[in-house]
């Protein structure tokens, strides 16, 4: 969200954290579509006005244009409705090198790109002041450029057995609800 505070916050001083007003003026939103190459850490990102199947297909086309021919592209997705829309599935049928994998409900942490989103939020967006969507998108694009200048491969720090156990606990919890 492009947010502007109604008043400037007080700066940090020795022994006191900086402050920020609770109220703000909202100047609009943007959607960041991002694809993380886990092997080298590079991120392909596109800011778009909305998050519908049309924008998602445009982003898939950007991935298609940026990944060398002949490589299989594994796309990890949440269960957002736009990802399963018939036109998206038709696009997928026409692009057999793309393979979609959907994370279980409430398991977005299994998607490595979520780590990138968290880092972007912490380092660039949190406590930021953006007086327009254009300012917000410029900040996101600068961060993408910086991150891609010296990318780092994504490495899981949790042991695979812990990850699988967490997924199984989540599945059991969901199945017990029904």
Predicted regions and their residues:
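RNase H-like polynucleotidyl transferase catalytic core
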Residues: 16-24, 94-112, 128-130
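Extended, low-complexity cationic-aromatic segments
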Residues: 1-61, 167-171
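Short glycine-/polar-rich loops that comprise or flank the Walker A/P-loop
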Residues: 40, 71-72, 95-99
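Short, aromatic/basic amphipathic alpha-helical patches
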Residues: 85-95
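Acidic/histidine-rich, metal-coordinating catalytic segments
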Residues: 71-83
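C-terminal domain-tail junction helix/linker
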Residues: 135-178
């Amino acid at each position: 969200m492009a947010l502007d505070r109604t008043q400037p916050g007080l700066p940090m001083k020795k022994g006191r954290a900086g402050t920020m007003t609770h109220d703000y003026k909202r100047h609009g939103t943007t959607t960041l579509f991002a694809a993380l190459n886990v092997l080298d850490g590079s991120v392909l990102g596109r800011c778009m006005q909305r998050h519908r199947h049309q924008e998602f297909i445009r982003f898939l086309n950007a991935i298609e244009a940026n990944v060398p021919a002949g490589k299989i592209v594994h796309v990890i997705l949440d269960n957002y409705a736009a990802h399963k829309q018939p036109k998206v599935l038709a696009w997928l049928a026409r692009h057999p090198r793309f393979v979609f994998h959907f994370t279980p409900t409430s398991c977005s942490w299994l998607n490595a790109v979520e780590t990138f989103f968290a880092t972007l939020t912490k380092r660039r967006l949190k406590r930021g002041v953006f007086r327009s969507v254009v300012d917000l998108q410029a900040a996101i694009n600068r961060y993408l450029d910086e991150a891609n200048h010296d990318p780092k491969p994504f490495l899981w720090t949790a042991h695979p057995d812990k990850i699988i156990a967490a997924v199984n606990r989540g599945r059991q919890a969901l199945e017990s609800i029904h």
